[in-house]
C-alpha cells in the first residue's frame, strides 16, 4: 500500500517538468498522419529505392489530407507538406520512367494550374524540358503566370525567367517571350536586358536557319530539275535502242506480217483495194531499208570485233 501512496503523492511530469496541482495538463498536439506518410515515402524513395511504394505512400498521404479536410484539419499539416508530397511523387514517377504522367498526377490534387506551388511548377518545367518536351507545360505555366495572385509571390520573377529560357525559347515562341519580359514588373532592369538579349540572339539564329534552309532547297530543286531534263533524252534513247534491237531480232517476214496486221486493226484499210497498193509498196521499201541498215550495222560490228 505504501507504493500506492507514494505513487499518488508523486508529482505529475509533463513536457515542461513537474506539474503543480494548480496547473492544467497541457495536451500534446496530435501529429498529422500525412506527415508520417511523407517521411515514409521519402525513406522509400531515397534509402530503399522502392519508387512504386514511395508513389503509393504519397497517394495515401494525399488521401489522408483529403479526409481530414472534411472535418477539421489537424495542426501540423501545411502547404509545405503537400508540396513535399508532390516533390517525392514527381521524383518517383521520373525514376520509373513515367515522367509523362507527372503533370496530370500533380493536377489531380491541385485541380487547376494556378494553385500549383512554385517549387512544384519549377520541377515540372525542369523535367519536361530535360526530356525535350517543353510544349507539355506551355499552357500550364502560362496560366500560372497570368494569375494575379501569383504575380505577387517572390518566386514569380525567377519562375517567369525560367519559363522563358526552358520553354518559350526552345519552342521558338519569341514574341510571347518578349511580351512576357517587357510586360512584367517582376524583372529587374538588368535581368530584363539580359533576357531580351537572349531573345534577340535566338531570333537572329532562327532567321539564319530559315534563310539557310531556303538556300539549300534551291540548288536541290535546280539539280533535280536539270537531272530530270538530262536523264529524259537518255531514257528515250534507251527505249528506242531497246525497241530497235527487239525489232531487229524478229525475222523480216514476221515483222512485215505484224505491220500488216497492225495496219488492218488500226488504220482499217483493205489490202486488196487499188488505193492500198501504194501504201504497201512504201511499207515494203521501208522494211527493206531497215533490214539493210540492220545488216550493215551488224557487219560493221563483226569487222570491229
UniProtKB/Swiss-Prot annotation:
Cytoplasmic topology ranges: 1-246
Molecular functions (GO terms): ATPase binding; protein-containing complex binding; protein-membrane adaptor activity
InterPro entries per record: Pex26 (IPR010797)
Transmembrane intervals: 247-267
Location in or out of the cell: Peroxisome membrane
Domain of life of the organism encoding this protein: Eukaryota
Protein keywords: Disease variant, Membrane, Peroxisome, Peroxisome biogenesis disorder, Protein transport, Signal-anchor, Transmembrane, Transmembrane helix, Transport, Zellweger syndrome
Membrane-topology descriptor: Single-pass type II membrane protein
Entry GO terms, CC: cytosol; peroxisomal membrane; peroxisome
Spans annotated as Disordered: 1-20
Tissue expression per record: Widely expressed. Highly expressed in kidney, liver, brain and skeletal muscles. Expressed at intermediate level in pancreas, placenta and heart. Weakly expressed in lung.
Stretches assigned to the Peroxisomal matrix side: 268-305
GO biological process, one term: protein import into peroxisome matrix
Known function: Peroxisomal docking factor that anchors PEX1 and PEX6 to peroxisome membranes. PEX26 is therefore required for the formation of the PEX1-PEX6 AAA ATPase complex, a complex that mediates the extraction of the PEX5 receptor from peroxisomal membrane.
PANTHER family named among the record's database cross-references: PEROXISOME ASSEMBLY PROTEIN 26 (PTHR16262:SF2)
Family classification: Belongs to the peroxin-26 family.
Quaternary structure (record): Interacts (via its cytoplasmic domain) with PEX6; interaction is direct and is ATP-dependent. Interacts with PEX1; interaction is indirect and is mediated via interaction with PEX6.
Disease: Peroxisome biogenesis disorder complementation group 8: A peroxisomal disorder arising from a failure of protein import into the peroxisomal membrane or matrix. The peroxisome biogenesis disorders (PBD group) are genetically heterogeneous with at least 14 distinct genetic groups as concluded from complementation studies. Include disorders are: Zellweger syndrome (ZWS), neonatal adrenoleukodystrophy (NALD), infantile Refsum disease (IRD), and classical rhizomelic chondrodysplasia punctata (RCDP).
Protein name: Peroxisome assembly protein 26
Gene (UniProt): PEX26
Amino acid at each position: 500500500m505504501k507504493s500506492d501512496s507514494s505513487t499518488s503523492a508523486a508529482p505529475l511530469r509533463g513536457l515542461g517538468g513537474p506539474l503543480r496541482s494548480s496547473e492544467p495538463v497541457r495536451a500534446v498536439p496530435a501529429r498529422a498522419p500525412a506527415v508520417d506518410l511523407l517521411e515514409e515515402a521519402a525513406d522509400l524513395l531515397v534509402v530503399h529505392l522502392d519508387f512504386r511504394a514511395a508513389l503509393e505512400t504519397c497517394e495515401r498521404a494525399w488521401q489522408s489530407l483529403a479526409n481530414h479536410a472534411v472535418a477539421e484539419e489537424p495542426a501540423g499539416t501545411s502547404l509545405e507538406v503537400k508540396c513535399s508530397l508532390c516533390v517525392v511523387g514527381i521524383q518517383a514517377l521520373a525514376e520509373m520512367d513515367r515522367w509523362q504522367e507527372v503533370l496530370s498526377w500533380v493536377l489531380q490534387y491541385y485541380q487547376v494550374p494556378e494553385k500549383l506551388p512554385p517549387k512544384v511548377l519549377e520541377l515540372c518545367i525542369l523535367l519536361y524540358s530535360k526530356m525535350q518536351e517543353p510544349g507539355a507545360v506551355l499552357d500550364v505555366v502560362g496560366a500560372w503566370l497570368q494569375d494575379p495572385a501569383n504575380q505577387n509571390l517572390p518566386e514569380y520573377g525567377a519562375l517567369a525567367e525560367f519559363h522563358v529560357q526552358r520553354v518559350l525559347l526552345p519552342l521558338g515562341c519569341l514574341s510571347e517571350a518578349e511580351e512576357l519580359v517587357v510586360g512584367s514588373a517582376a524583372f529587374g532592369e538588368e535581368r530584363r536586358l539580359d533576357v531580351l538579349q537572349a531573345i534577340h540572339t535566338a531570333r537572329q539564329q532562327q532567321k539564319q536557319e530559315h534563310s539557310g534552309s531556303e538556300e539549300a532547297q534551291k540548288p536541290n530543286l535546280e539539280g533535280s530539275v536539270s537531272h530530270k531534263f538530262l536523264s529524259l533524252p537518255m531514257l528515250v534513247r534507251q527505249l528506242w535502242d531497246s525497241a530497235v534491237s527487239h525489232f531487229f531480232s524478229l525475222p523480216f517476214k514476221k515483222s512485215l506480217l505484224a505491220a500488216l496486221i497492225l495496219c488492218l486493226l488500226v488504220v482499217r484499210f483493205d489490202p486488196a483495194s487499188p488505193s492500198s497498193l501504194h501504201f504497201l509498196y512504201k511499207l515494203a521499201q521501208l522494211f527493206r531499208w531497215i533490214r539493210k541498215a540492220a545488216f550493215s550495222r551488224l557487219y560493221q560490228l563483226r569487222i570491229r570485233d
